């Protein structure tokens, strides 16, 4: 899959949605395309998740997502007060669980890494294209009073991907 963007391109949200042919509303989008997944990250001050960049941008550490606010058990429910979920109450995998399982299959069983296309929010409506990454690891960390998912992604040397890469 070729992309019309180059790493570091500054784009509008509309450009992002046109490129992906969908209106992206959530940060983690597992297998949104046959040949890749998408994550939307933010390093902005006051960003809701502790995403970070290492090794001059070649490694991303992406934090998983909280329980949706609509799942609250009452007024004042704080999603940051509970562990990030892997699955819903019915046992269906949520995005955290899908990405986690894919990373573990790669790390522990040498399955091909999930290819992930990464966009970074610069400010409202303005994004940066960060390129294609391989999802190479995942784990849970203690964060104050709860557990959060962490996902390690490595920048792909090959930025033009095809199904044969997958």
Predicted features along the sequence, with ranges:
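Compact mixed alphabeta submodule
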Residues: 122-166
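Polar low-complexity intrinsically disordered regions
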Residues: 1-2, 164
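Acidic, glycine-rich low-complexity segments with interspersed aromatic residues
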Residues: 2-128
């Amino acid at each position: 899959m070729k992309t019309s963007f180059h790493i570091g391109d500054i784009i509008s949200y509309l450009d992002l949605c046109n490129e992906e042919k969908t209106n992206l509303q959530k940060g983690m989008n597992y297998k949104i395309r046959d040949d890749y997944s998408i994550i939307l990250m933010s390093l902005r001050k006051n960003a809701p998740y502790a995403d970070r960049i290492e090794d001059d941008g070649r490694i991303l550490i992406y934090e998983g997502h909280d329980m949706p606010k609509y799942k609250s058990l009452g007024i004042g429910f704080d999603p940051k007060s509970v562990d990030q979920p892997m699955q819903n109450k019915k046992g269906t995998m949520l995005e955290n669980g899908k990405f986690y399982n894919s990373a573990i299959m790669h790390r522990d069983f040498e399955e091909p890494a999930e290819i992930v296309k990464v966009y970074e929010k610069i400010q409202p409506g303005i994004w940066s294209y960060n390129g294609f990454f391989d999802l190479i690891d995942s784990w849970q960390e203690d964060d104050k009073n709860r557990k959060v998912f962490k996902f390690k992604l490595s920048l792909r040397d090959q930025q033009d991907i095809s199904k044969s890469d997958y």
